[in-house]
Amino acid sequence: MSQLKITQVRSTIGARWKQRESLRTLGLRRIRHSVIREDNAATRGLIAVVRHLVEVEPAQTGGKT
């Protein structure tokens, strides 16, 4: 399954409780903090709630093979 890199780009000041909880569930704590999550329906739902606070891009699967 593919993965997504999610980066918080805006502050939670003034954000609603549901948006703050969604960021916390994703594992984001501060601006410019990034996490890698599986691309599934649950993750996409959380991203939809906070789409104005985050940037989403495909995760790079780097490493030596």
From Swiss-Prot:
Q: What GO terms fall under cellular component here? A: cytosolic large ribosomal subunit
The record's PROSITE patterns line, in alphabetical order, gives: RIBOSOMAL_L30 (PS00634)
Which is a GO BP term held by this UniProt record? translation
| Keywords attached to this entry | Ribonucleoprotein, Ribosomal protein
Query: Is the Ribosomal protein keyword given for this protein?
Result: yes
Superkingdom, taxonomy of origin:
Bacteria
- Cite a single GO MF annotation: structural constituent of ribosome
What InterPro entries does its record include? Ribo_uL30_ferredoxin-like_sf, Ribosomal_uL30_bac-type, Ribosomal_uL30_CS, Ribosomal_uL30_ferredoxin-like
Q: Does the keyword Ribonucleoprotein apply?
A: yes
Q: Which Pfam families match?
A: Ribosomal_L30
The similarity annotation says: Belongs to the universal ribosomal protein uL30 family.
- State how it assembles: Part of the 50S ribosomal subunit.
Q: What is this protein called?
A: Large ribosomal subunit protein uL30
**Native organism:** Mycobacterium tuberculosis (strain ATCC 25177 / H37Ra)
Q: What is the lineage of its organism?
A: Bacteria, Bacillati, Actinomycetota, Actinomycetes, Mycobacteriales
